Amino acid sequence: MTDLGQAGESLVAAWLEQQGGKILQQRWRSPWGEIDLITHFPDTKIIAFVEVKTRSGGNWDQGGLLAVNARKQEKIWQTANHFLASQPQWSDWNCRFDVMIVFSQGSVPTGENAEGKFANLPTNFQMGQTIVWQGYRLRLEQYLTDAFGG
């Protein structure tokens, strides 16, 4: 995974926590693939398996949406089943499959921001707001709840 992809995932993890989610796993692997984020929402008894797509301008796949095709969905679904089989304490929770699109406006030039790569997140950041995070300018573009079925 690229540094940009990791920055996008960690930004989404922070945003999910601000929304009341608790991150169970990040980059959880199984023989079928990897799930970027596994989050639970205690107030609703929901576990979200979140696929994060971080893209810059001029990409071929509509900001990452086309990359979550039927084959990718099947891999995520199989990996989620493997996770649930290995973690029986979550077996009675409802599950959903979400997708977050993160747009990168490029890296922050050295010296532009004294904190640059290590800038702290605002206490409450919103969708559409550009954030300097881990050396990149990132914007949470779109969060698709229950984007595909299992």
Curated annotation (Swiss-Prot):
Annotated InterPro entries: Restrct_endonuc-II-like, tRNA_endonuc-like_dom_sf, UPF0102_YraN-like
GO MF term set: nucleic acid binding
Top-level lineage group: Bacteria
Transmembrane segments: none
Family: Belongs to the UPF0102 family.
NCBIfam families: YraN family protein
Protein name listed in UniProt: UPF0102 protein sll0189
Organism: Synechocystis sp. (strain ATCC 27184 / PCC 6803 / Kazusa)
